């Protein structure tokens, strides 16, 4: 009984995760932009909600399909939420695959430009 419940839980949670966190095959570009905007604003930690949400609002409409795919991989890929925040806020150095990503560089520049200078 317990193993059936656990199996059902993992099946449902895996299905839901694939719908909300991964690229959807055959997804139209407008639907992808809408999904990424939502996912950028609802990250799970307020810091990323603000940083990524603001970036997405201002930039997703201008991004090409390959850029959207790279952004999707950046925010929904293997990196933990706090790690993304630490990379963007200069608290941790990003790994080479993140640092070399042009979309990450755009997000990083956006975040750096928003930073309030210390007096």
UniProtKB/Swiss-Prot annotation:
Record keywords: Chaperone, Mitochondrion
Stored Pfam families: Sdh5
UniProt superkingdom: Eukaryota
Main location: mitochondrion
Gene Ontology cellular component annotations, sorted alphabetically: mitochondrial matrix; mitochondrion
Presence of keyword Chaperone: yes
UniProt record, GO biological process: mitochondrial electron transport, succinate to ubiquinone; mitochondrial respiratory chain complex II assembly; tricarboxylic acid cycle
UniProt-annotated location(s): Mitochondrion matrix
UniProt similarity note: Belongs to the SDHAF2 family.
Note: This protein may be expected to contain an N-terminal transit peptide but none has been predicted.
Subunit structure: Interacts with the flavoprotein subunit within the SDH catalytic dimer.
Function: Plays an essential role in the assembly of succinate dehydrogenase (SDH), an enzyme complex (also referred to as respiratory complex II) that is a component of both the tricarboxylic acid (TCA) cycle and the mitochondrial electron transport chain, and which couples the oxidation of succinate to fumarate with the reduction of ubiquinone (coenzyme Q) to ubiquinol. Required for flavinylation (covalent attachment of FAD) of the flavoprotein subunit of the SDH catalytic dimer.
UniProt cross-references to PANTHER family, sorted A to Z: PROTEIN EMI5 HOMOLOG, MITOCHONDRIAL, SUCCINATE DEHYDROGENASE ASSEMBLY FACTOR 2, MITOCHONDRIAL
Protein name in the entry: Succinate dehydrogenase assembly factor 2, mitochondrial
């Amino acid at each position: 009984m317990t193993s059936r419940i656990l199996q059902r839980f993992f099946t449902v949670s895996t299905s839901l995760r694939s719908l909300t966190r991964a690229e959807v095959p055959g997804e139209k570009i407008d639907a992808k932009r809408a999904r990424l905007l939502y996912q950028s604003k609802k990250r799970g930690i307020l810091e990323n909600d603000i940083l990524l949400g603001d970036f997405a609002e201002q930039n997703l409409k201008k991004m090409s399909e390959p850029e959207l795919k790279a952004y999707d991989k950046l925010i929904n890929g293997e990196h933990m939420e706090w790690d993304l925040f630490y990379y963007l806020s200069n608290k941790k150095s990003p790994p080479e695959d993140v640092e070399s990503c042009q979309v990450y560089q755009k997000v990083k520049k956006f975040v750096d430009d928003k930073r309030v200078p210390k007096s």
